[in-house]
UniProtKB/Swiss-Prot annotation:
Catalytic activity: L-arginine + H2O = L-citrulline + NH4(+)
Protein name: Arginine deiminase
Subcellular localization, as worded in the UniProt entry: Cytoplasm
TM region(s), chain numbering: none
Enzyme class: hydrolase
Active site: C401
UniProt keyword annotations, A-Z: Arginine metabolism, Cytoplasm, Hydrolase
Taxonomic lineage from the root: Bacteria, Bacillati, Bacillota, Bacilli, Lactobacillales
Gene expressing this chain: arcA
SUPFAM superfamilies the record matches: Pentein
Listed InterPro entries: Arg_deiminase (IPR003876)
Pathway membership: Amino-acid degradation; L-arginine degradation via ADI pathway; carbamoyl phosphate from L-arginine: step 1/2
Amino acid sequence: MTAQTPIHVYSEIGKLKKVLLHRPGKEIENLMPDYLERLLFDDIPFLEDAQKEHDAFAQALRDEGVEVLYLETLAAESLVTPEIREAFIDEYLSEANIRGRATKKAIRELLMSIEDNQELIEKTMAGVQKSELPEIPAAEKGLTDLVESSYPFAIDPMPNLYFTRDPFATIGTGVSLNHMFSETRNRETIYGKYIFTHHPIYGGGKVPMVYDRNETTRIEGGDELVLSKDVLAVGISQRTDAASIEKLLVNIFKQKLGFKKVLAFEFANNRKFMHLDTVFTMVDYDKFTIHPEIEGDLRVYSVTYENEELRIVEETGDLAELLAANLGVEHVELIRCGGDNLVAAGREQWNDGSNTLTIAPGVVVVYNRNTITNAILESKGLKLIKIHGSELVRGRGGPRCMSMPFEREDI
């Protein structure tokens, strides 16, 4: 990394030097059973234990020499002037789907009254309950205030924020600032916008943008994998559509970030397989985890850029051979999540057995609960750093989902 390139990520496996996390906060305590689907959760984590698990995850990374950054801290550091701070508040409010002018005014006054920038950022992440606001006089209530009086939130929380992989993705020296699948998560990208616009280290045009949050088609970081300095992998999934991938790839090639080819993976469109990295991750120079259930239906396209146009070819050969040829290795091994047992594979994929974070070639952070997959990985010579995640996993994401590399050593 140099002063000109604060982002440097040219692989999935190079030694991890710097990573972005988000410690789960009060947004988790604003989950409630009636609105889990709306907020893209299946269960409610216990915040105190989730924070302990997340702190242990961060410490495990530090113990391996990784510098840990926090989203909430970088976002707070990006509010460098009162004018930028006020602009952030107004943009946040404009995207929060607030019902009623009087309600919006009361929330703005609440946020403007918070003096500490990090406290402000954490409050915007947590959401605002109606009970926190002064009672609006009946004469000032609009129709929406009256019709939706039973809904408890004036602004929804952002409980998915601890999955920092998705709102934006680091690619080479650039960043894809994503337009996300759901309204619930699309609001999360405001923090990346302010970091990469105003932060003293990461703002000011130092990081080229290869996708913009104002695009109308969806893409998420769990579908963006950097396999090598030459090759990217992208997923066409529940959360990322093909049109977004085409826009992303044109920008990457035009920005000349060094990549020569992209492998686009098309697979089942459902929550169980919401992102490519929930079913496929790179763990060593020549090894990948894969969920066996996707192998039969998987389609792969090779994409290159020639004469200012994308050239797309559907690949028909063996996946392992295709990966080996593109990575310049003799052989690639696909390690099946859960092994050959369909019950174990289904259970451990649901608990993110395939969602590993590689912090150096052959050194992988995993949830300890996926015992069958972990034993297979160890039998292949991989070093595992096992973390507890009984609460964290309730959000349906693993170590890769919970981390966004900012700097890796080249391989």
